[in-house]
UniProtKB/Swiss-Prot annotation:
Effect annotated for changing residue 267 to E: 43% reduced binding to LRP6
Function: Antagonizes canonical Wnt signaling by inhibiting LRP5/6 interaction with Wnt and by forming a ternary complex with the transmembrane protein KREMEN that promotes internalization of LRP5/6. Inhibits the pro-apoptotic function of KREMEN1 in a Wnt-independent manner, and has anti-apoptotic activity. Plays a role in limb development; attenuates Wnt signaling in the developing limb to allow normal limb patterning.
Record's subcellular location: Secreted
Signal peptide: 1-31
Domains: entry comment: The C-terminal cysteine-rich domain mediates interaction with LRP5 and LRP6.
Protein name: Dickkopf-related protein 1
Organism the protein comes from: Mus musculus (Mouse)
Length: 272
């Protein structure tokens, strides 16, 4: 009986020893797996800029293609957009103009920057504010009518543009603003065009005040009502200023117009 018990104890001890020896590789594999799992979490705590969006600790890395940080993230231009400062329109692109942004723009501080051009029927103060193919008329961007531009002037501008492009290709390589655009802006203004002086307007037009700005208006013809200024410089008080009478005409009191008050007599353009 004791011999049987001793044999059973020996068998049990042998089996237990074998189980202990077999469990060692499993424990090693488990430890290795745990270390891999622990190390796999390290990708979530990478230092910037490899730690995902913003590079903050604990932020997950996106596995979508094209989203990894490469210095040119497609979302970076929207969040970190920097306006281009300028001093005049020529420093901006062909579809931009130089001006101060609206008061609602934050972080600009009143500095002039390049803004997107204004499309047709949008308010404007000068030609450069309107998109290509439009010009400023009566404070509104209107489509340009190129028929009044001299053909020779346009051809000369194209030749100058080709010369500038050739110089840019052979020289520093920087693009230059075309001459044609500047010539269009400096052509004689038509009726309703914004102006500063009468020399800015075409023949038969003068520069006269209209609301808050000055526009090209027709020179008065014979029989049309005119304004007789008693003092020099008094025309600056008019909101709707009239042009002067045409050549050979003078602003005089209408002969067949009789009023009781001398101040209300009607003046018209008459022959000398």
């Amino acid at each position: 009986m004791m011999v049987v018990c001793a044999a059973a104890a020996v068998r049990f001890l042998a089996v237990f020893t074998m189980m202990a020896l077999c469990s060692l590789p499993l424990l090693g594999a488990s430890a290795t797996l745990n270390s891999v799992l622990i190390n796999s979490n390290a990708i979530k705590n990478l230092p910037p800029p490899l730690g995902g969006a913003g590079g903050q600790p604990g932020s997950a890395v996106s596995v979508a293609p094209g989203v990894l940080y490469e210095g040119g993230n497609k979302y970076q231009t929207l969040d970190n957009y920097q306006p281009y400062p300028c001093a005049e329109d020529e420093e901006c692109g062909s579809d931009e103009y130089c001006s101060s942004p609206s008061r609602g723009a934050a972080g600009v501080g009143g500095v002039q920057i390049c803004l997107a051009c204004r499309k047709r029927r949008k308010r404007c103060m000068r030609h450069a504010m309107c998109c290509p193919g439009n010009y400023c008329k009566n404070g509104i961007c209107m489509p340009s009518d190129h028929s009044h531009f001299p053909r020779g002037e346009i051809e000369e501008s194209i030749i100058e543009n080709l010369g500038n492009d050739h110089n840019a290709a052979a020289g520093d390589g920087y693009p230059r603003r075309t001459t044609l655009t500047s010539k269009i802006y400096h052509t004689k203004g038509q009726e309703g065009s914004v102006c500063l002086r009468s020399s800015d307007c075409a023949a038969g037009l003068c520069c006269a005040r209209h609301f808050w700005s000055k526009i090209c208006k027709p020179v008065l013809k014979e029989g049309q009502v005119c304004t007789k200024h008693k003092r020099k410089g008094s025309h600056g008080l008019e909101i709707f200023q009239r042009c002067y009478c045409g050549e050979g005409l003078a602003c005089r009191i209408q002969k067949d117009h009789h009023q009781a008050s001398n101040s209300s007599r009607l003046h018209t353009c008459q022959r000398h």
